[in-house]
């Protein structure tokens, strides 16, 4: 997935608007308890600073390679300068940051002893005149939506510090909607009216409980309430973060789609929500579907919670997470008939169209890969029925297959276009098709529709047959013949 979007990241511009914060860390060791009070004594060793709040969202985007601009307030103080410098060092455009007189840069200072957070001290000053502040930001941000340099995605990072007023949010969302720019919101508080007509909201479980009033009940009840909220706000989808249970996509489908958590170890959840909204925005800007973008965001969150303190993810870490994920997914993609039937039922429940194709796929070549990619585009999922070795021998002769069935299945499962590989030992896939009940039956364009095995069955339950163009001059038989001729 990342290979397909990495180049797009570098070509996309994301604008972040919200509450800027500086995270300060005081690192040391704890070896004793104070004689003055029952508190640990921390022997200070070093101090570090990181971007927090909306600044951390921007930091994640920049580390993923996107052109990133940020708009918000800092105070006319040294912490504000430290934060601006940190953003600029990450390559983030800070021209939209306004120093605000009489206001302190929001700073969170954490004392860390022996890799354990001992204390957090917050310094923040309430905005004295929120209407004036909103007007200043309005004047700053609205011109950034116009012209050739306008963003591909806007992210509103709301920490309820008074920066994202109702008036500012609605002005941004309405103008962006008219321009076709998606607006993603990491929300706060119990009044979500300010986010009406946004593209997506990413509340966590607690935030969704707070705004919907569903304090008790199971997760399904909460997600049902989330769907009602989505409809009332005219929002395209909710990405509900569920800690150890992953992320749920609430978008009007019959059942919310769940993406399981991928974290191996959890050290610190600070900033995980920032990483989710940033990676989701990056994925959508790069052209991913909302489900694929959320899958990417879920992997990214699994990386950052394994770090101590507020942290951002970079491309190398995301590559590693995707490789690990692909390793696990590959074995899961090879299924028996019963498992395949269950998985397809789940996809159907999520409103996804399932494409089925079949073949021997002996000596996988570029023609096969192109065919499978085209077949996958006919729906949302591609199931590949693979002839067993015995079946191939009956069809192709005793010298075939050249590659054993488990090896063929393993290679095919590694392809991004293939969602499931199912072996069948019959001469035709008719029985398998009857069991799996796909929506679309794909076959090479060297067949006629009336020649496609299972076509009548699929049409009977409302599906269709699709003929896919083949790459000329590419076939396993041709390769085998050329090899034999050279002996």
UniProtKB/Swiss-Prot annotation:
GO biological process: one example: ADP-L-glycero-beta-D-manno-heptose biosynthetic process
Reactions catalysed according to its record: D-glycero-beta-D-manno-heptose 7-phosphate + ATP = D-glycero-beta-D-manno-heptose 1,7-bisphosphate + ADP + H(+); D-glycero-beta-D-manno-heptose 1-phosphate + ATP + H(+) = ADP-D-glycero-beta-D-manno-heptose + diphosphate
PROSITE patterns per UniProt: PFKB_KINASES_1 (PS00583)
Pathway: Nucleotide-sugar biosynthesis; ADP-L-glycero-beta-D-manno-heptose biosynthesis; ADP-L-glycero-beta-D-manno-heptose from D-glycero-beta-D-manno-heptose 7-phosphate: step 1/4; Nucleotide-sugar biosynthesis; ADP-L-glycero-beta-D-manno-heptose biosynthesis; ADP-L-glycero-beta-D-manno-heptose from D-glycero-beta-D-manno-heptose 7-phosphate: step 3/4
Region annotated Cytidylyltransferase, chain positions: 356-487
Keywords in alphabetical order: ATP-binding, Carbohydrate metabolism, Kinase, Multifunctional enzyme, Nucleotide-binding, Nucleotidyltransferase, Transferase
EC number: 2.7.1.167, 2.7.7.70
Annotated catalytic residues: 274
Signal peptide per UniProt: none
GO molecular function terms noted in the UniProt entry: ATP binding; heptose 7-phosphate kinase activity; heptose-1-phosphate adenylyltransferase activity; phosphotransferase activity, alcohol group as acceptor
Residues holding ATP: 204-207
Stretches for region Ribokinase: 1-329
Cellular component aspect of the GO annotation: cytosol
Taxonomic superkingdom: Bacteria
Transmembrane segments annotated in the record for this chain: none
Family statement drawn from the similarity comment of this UniProt entry: In the N-terminal section; belongs to the carbohydrate kinase PfkB family.
HAMAP family for the chain: HldE
SUBUNIT field: Homodimer.
Its biological purpose: Catalyzes the ADP transfer from ATP to D-glycero-beta-D-manno-heptose 1-phosphate, yielding ADP-D-glycero-beta-D-manno-heptose.
This protein's name: Bifunctional protein HldE
Upper lineage: Bacteria, Pseudomonadati, Pseudomonadota, Alphaproteobacteria, Magnetococcales
Gene field: hldE
């Amino acid at each position: 997935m990342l290979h397909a979007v990495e180049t797009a990241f570098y070509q996309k511009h994301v604008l972040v608007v919200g509450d800027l914060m500086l995270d300060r860390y005081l690192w040391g060791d704890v070896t004793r308890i104070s004689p003055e009070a029952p508190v640990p004594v921390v022997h200070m060793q070093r101090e570090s600073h990181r971007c927090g709040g909306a600044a951390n969202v921007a930091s994640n985007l920049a580390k993923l390679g996107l052109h990133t601009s940020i708009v918000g307030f800092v105070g006319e103080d040294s912490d504000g300068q430290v934060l601006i410098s940190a953003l600029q060092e990450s390559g983030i455009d800070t021209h939209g940051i306004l120093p605000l007189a009489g206001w302190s840069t929001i700073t969170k200072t954490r004392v860390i002893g022996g890799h354990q957070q001992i204390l957090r001290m917050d310094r923040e000053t309430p905005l004295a005149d929120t209407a004036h502040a909103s007007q200043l930001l309005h004047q700053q941000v609205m011109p950034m939506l116009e012209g050739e340099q306008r963003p591909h995605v806007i992210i509103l990072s709301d920490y309820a510090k008074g920066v994202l007023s109702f008036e500012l949010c609605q002005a941004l969302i309405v103008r962006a909607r008219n321009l076709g720019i998606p607006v993603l919101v990491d929300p706060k508080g119990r009044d979500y009216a300010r986010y009406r007509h946004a593209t997506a909201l990413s509340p966590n479980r607690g935030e969704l409980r707070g705004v919907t009033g569903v304090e008790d009940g199971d997760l399904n009840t909460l997600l049902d309430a989330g769907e009602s909220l989505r409809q009332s706000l005219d929002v395209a989808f909710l990405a509900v973060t569920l800690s150890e249970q992953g992320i749920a996509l609430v978008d009007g489908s019959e059942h919310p789609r769940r993406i399981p958590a991928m974290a191996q170890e959890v050290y610190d959840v600070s900033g995980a929500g920032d990483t989710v909204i940033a990676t989701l925005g990056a994925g959508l800007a790069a052209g991913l579907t909302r489900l694929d973008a959320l899958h990417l965001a879920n992997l990214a969150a699994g990386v950052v919670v394994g770090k101590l303190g507020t942290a951002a993810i970079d491309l190398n870490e995301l590559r590693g997470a995707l490789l690990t994920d692909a390793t696990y997914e590959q074995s899961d993609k090879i299924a028996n008939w019963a498992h395949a039937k269950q998985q397809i039922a789940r996809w159907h429940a999520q409103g996804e169209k399932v494409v089925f194709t079949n073949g021997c796929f002996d000596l996988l070549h570029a023609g096969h890969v192109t065919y499978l990619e085209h077949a996958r585009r006919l729906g949302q999922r591609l199931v590949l029925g693979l002839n067993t070795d015995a079946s191939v021998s009956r069809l192709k002769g005793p010298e075939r297959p050249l590659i054993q069935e488990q090896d063929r299945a393993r290679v095919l499962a590694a392809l991004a276009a293939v969602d499931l590989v199912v072996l069948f030992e019959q001469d035709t896939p008719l029985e398998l098709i009857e069991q799996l009940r796909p929506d679309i039956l794909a076959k090479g364009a060297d067949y006629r529709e009336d020649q496609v095995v299972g076509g009548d069955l699929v049409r009977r339950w409302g599906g269709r047959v699709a003929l896919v163009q083949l790459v000329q001059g590419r076939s396993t038989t041709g390769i085998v013949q050329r090899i034999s001729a050279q002996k």
